[in-house]
Amino acid sequence: MSLTKRLFRALGYEPRRPRRRQYEGATLSRLTSSWITSGTSADAEVHGSLSRLRNRARQLVRDSDYARQAKRAVMNNVIGTGIKLQSQVMMQRGGRLDEELNKRIEKAWKRWGYKSYCDVAGRLCFADIERMIVGAMCESGEVFVRVIRRPFGGSDIPFALQIIESDQLDETYTGKSSANGNEWRMGVEVDQFGRAVQYAFLQKHPGDAPFSGTAAKRHLMLS
């Protein structure tokens, strides 16, 4: 064997055998000749079939004990009984915990977590909201949480949460934006760097047909 061939072999390069260096998955044979693939982006791949995939996933959770248990296991392991706040504010002097202030903070946090305060609809306590968010991510892939900076239910804290199902994001809202050059992609306005700027939500759930009327196609733009 010549010195050149030895050098090529040591470097892992064999000029006479280029075919053998190709990825096996890219070769055409009787086993792969009917294997049709696409090189579309993630958005293009899911566009047009997102709602169908989401609905099938939800039905699977409703009808299958295995899928339902998998969702329950995710919620139990990620959230459990919910986030517990432990305040550790230090005193200005002495380097010790301010126990009195910490107790007041923890009490205020716990009180805000009541369903009449933390949920704009007054239906879910904060632990239930957490479980719903994680469950929706497991089942539907995503969920939206809108922060409302005003008090609800007589709360002293101007802060509450609104859960918005992913169905309400209008995936058909696609195209160029107005003057700023941003682009709408499946209900999400993104800038030149792909950062989400604004969302186009339907004001009513599209599946709530008996109660939606024409208002279902009116958009609520949130940033």
Model-derived features: where do they sit?
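N-terminal-proximal low-complexity accessory segments that begin disordered
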Residues: M1-G94
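Structured, mid-chain assembly/scaffold modules that mediate subunit interfaces
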Residues: A70-S223
